[in-house]
């Protein structure tokens, strides 16, 4: 494994980024970040990033944005109900009860959609290195639960990546920020407000150790919510002026969403902007236009409640870390939303100090992930760093009366392992069912059900006699594993949590195969496009040359070229790259006669315009020059 290339990926709600070591890699469009947008077109293409974003207005129902908000979630989750009305694409219930996406007549898991983004980033890294890339560290919001982390890891597998580690976004940011700052011990707070999620982590840095003391957050708070507040305001303004509700028009909504995001960004550096959308809709009287003057003050009033929501998690994280505000040495801002002046002001007020502004909030997470990837891959230049992260949520089981009994508390350093001994409730009971939950509420039903499993084959015995030791293990990815051992017989059983949702191994394998097949299709499609472009370019240049120099070649050569052009034109519509290349080569070959004629013509023109050295004009007197040889005195 030593010396292998491993990349770091920040798979974001709005934008994603890939890095190697400490360098951010540009994508195929030359941009350092890639929009987390995937579109399925009517002709079977899958577009990712900026190309998908550009066609969103005309293909809104098949253009998937913010799929990270769905990853690892159940369809009946209250969050999903809120999301459905915000996006034009359709969210459907999968067979296992998870929230999936319907587009182009097919259903896709959020992991599949995320995998498309990962593939694009992986390809960018392969183009940059000139080598195949198969290993990665992928970041997730610190407050992601087990199902969301597992689904993110599945996305990596579908994309053909071995996910070396899932790490928390604030931890990755701290790694990038503090790599050269561990000579002295310091406490830092990472405030991460991105496109769809919010996290805050308190860390202690020193002597090459990055130790997370506490983390908190909100997996449903981010830039998308800010955009929605602006969009709703614009809809209401238009309704007041025109009496029409734009929420029933998907095309208008997509244009409004893009305008809202653009205005939000502009108001980070200006006090006022114009939102101008001509022909936003029409009625019997004709087309309607939207033109609104939008100020920073108005924006801040619309989103003040959202900004305030970031403070409670900050308070909880500080409390759990055992530190006071004045003990925080540095505050690091991460995520595009931290460019908003009102957000910076709120953070400054809470922590009592100006945030550190020496990192790029859009890139720092990917860089941190890449640093960790280089360490895990055994890079020769990898620094000796110890990363101690925590589990964001408590892990436990449902006990008598539906009570949630915690086995592992939140903010416990991971990896970690805890064991608990269970027994039977009835005589001769041969099996017990254990339901595993993650969360902080007192009652199990109010927390997130990770799954349940049954321990069978228990020997007949009076109730309370069998001693079944169940071990709960959270790995370095924050993903939960369970094992069990019958202490009476010494027999050990491997128990796999049967999650209530999530992708099965068979589904993942199928999706991996589909992704590989899609990659082959995309390659063939690209080859076809390139072949057609070359053919059309050759036809154009040959026809142009033929019109200018056709008289300089024989009629039979001219006929051969005309025939070759006709042959090539006839196969352009057949979508057969090899046939198009064959006919292109044939035209290129027969048109060589035309090239020879063009060369002779240019040579003739060149000779006609050059000075005539071998003849003189009539009456011109030629005088031989007189000269004297000067000998070099030094050469004797």
UniProtKB/Swiss-Prot annotation:
Residues 514-542, 598-636 are annotated as: Disordered. The keyword Chaperone applies. It holds the Pfam family HSP70. The modification Phosphothreonine is found at residue 197. GO terms for molecular function: ATP binding; ATP-dependent protein folding chaperone; unfolded protein binding. Transmembrane segments: none annotated. InterPro entries: ATPase_NBD, Chaperone_DnaK, Heat_shock_70_CS, HSP70_C_sf, HSP70_peptide-bd_sf, Hsp_70_fam. Residues 514-530, 614-624 have a biased composition (Basic and acidic residues). Keywords: ATP-binding, Chaperone, Nucleotide-binding, Phosphoprotein, Stress response. The keyword Cell inner membrane does not apply. Residues 601-613 have a biased composition (Polar residues). Induction: By stress conditions e.g. heat shock. Residues 625-636 have a biased composition (Acidic residues). Acts as a chaperone. Belongs to the heat shock protein 70 family. NCBIfam families: PRK00290.1, PRK05183.1, prok_dnaK. This is Chaperone protein DnaK.
């Amino acid at each position: 494994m030593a010396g292998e290339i491993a990349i770091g990926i920040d798979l974001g709600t709005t934008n994603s980024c890939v890095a190697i070591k400490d360098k951010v890699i540009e994508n195929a469009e030359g941009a350092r970040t890639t929009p987390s947008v995937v579109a399925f077109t009517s002709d079977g293409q899958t577009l990712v990033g900026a190309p998908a974003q550009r066609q969103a207005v005309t293909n809104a129902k098949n253009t998937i944005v913010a799929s990270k908000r769905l990853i690892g979630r159940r369809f009946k989750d209250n969050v999903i109900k809120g999301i459905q009305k915000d996006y034009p694409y359709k969210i459907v219930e999968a067979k296992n009860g998870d929230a999936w996406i319907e587009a182009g007549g097919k259903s896709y898991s959020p992991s599949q959609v995320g995998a498309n983004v990962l593939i694009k980033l992986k390809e960018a890294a392969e183009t940059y290195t000139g080598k195949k890339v198969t290993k990665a560290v992928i970041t997730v919001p610190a407050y992601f639960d087990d199902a969301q982390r597992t689904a993110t890891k599945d996305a990596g597998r579908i994309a053909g990546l071995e996910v070396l580690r899932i790490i928390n976004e604030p931890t990755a940011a701290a790694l990038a920020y503090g790599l050269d700052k561990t000579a002295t011990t310091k406490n830092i707070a990472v405030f991460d407000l991105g496109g769809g999620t919010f996290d805050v982590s308190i860390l202690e840095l020193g002597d090459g150790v990055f130790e997370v003391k506490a983390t908190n957050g909100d997996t449903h708070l981010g830039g998308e919510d800010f955009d929605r507040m602006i969009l709703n305001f614009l809809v209401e303004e238009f309704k007041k002026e025109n009496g029409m509700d734009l929420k029933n028009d998907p095309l208008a909504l997509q244009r409004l969403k893009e305008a809202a995001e653009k205005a939000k960004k502009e108001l980070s550096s200006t006090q006022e902007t114009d939102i101008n959308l001509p022909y936003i809709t029409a009625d019997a009287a004709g087309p309607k236009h939207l033109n609104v003057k939008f100020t920073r003050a108005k924006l801040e009033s619309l989103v003040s409640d959202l900004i305030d929501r970031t403070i409670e998690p900050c308070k909880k994280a500080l409390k759990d870390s055992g530190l006071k505000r004045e003990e925080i040495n540095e505050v690091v801002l991460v995520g595009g939303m931290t460019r908003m002046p009102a957000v910076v002001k709120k953070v400054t007020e809470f922590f009592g100090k100006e945030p550190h502004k020496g990192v790029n909030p859009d890139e720092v997470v990917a860089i941190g992930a890449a640093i960790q990837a280089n360490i895990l891959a055994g890079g020769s230049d990898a620094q000796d760093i110890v990363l101690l992260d925590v589990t964001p949520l408590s892990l436990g089981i449902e006990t008598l009366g539906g009570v949630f009994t915690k086995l592992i508390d939140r903010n416990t350093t991971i990896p970690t392992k805890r064991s608990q001994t269970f027994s039977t409730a009835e005589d001769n009971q041969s099996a017990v069912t254990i339901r595993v939950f993650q969360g902080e509420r007192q009652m199990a039903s109010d927390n997130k059900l990770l799954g349940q499993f049954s321990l069978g084959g228990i020997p007949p015995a009076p109730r309370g006699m069998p001693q079944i030791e169940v071990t709960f293990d959270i790995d370095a990815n924050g993903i939960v594993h369970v094992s069990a051992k019958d202490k009476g017989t010494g027999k050990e059983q491997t128990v796999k949590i049967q999650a209530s949702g999530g992708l099965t191994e068979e589904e993942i394998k199928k999706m991996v195969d589909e992704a590989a097949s899609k990659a082959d299709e995309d390659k063939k499609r690209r080859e076809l496009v390139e072949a057609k472009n070359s053919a059309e370019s050759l036809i154009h240049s040959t026809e142009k040359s033929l019109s200018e120099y056709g008289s300089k070649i024989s009629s039979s050569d001219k006929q051969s070229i005309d025939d070759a052009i006709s042959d090539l034109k006839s196969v352009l519509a057949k979508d057969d790259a090899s046939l198009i290349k064959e006919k292109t080569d044939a035209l290129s070959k027969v048109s060589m006669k035309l090239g020879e004629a063009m060369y002779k013509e240019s040579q003739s023109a060149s000779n006609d315009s050059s000075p005539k050295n071998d003849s003189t004009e009539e009456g011109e007197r030629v005088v031989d020059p007189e000269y004297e040889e000067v000998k070099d005195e030094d050469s004797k």
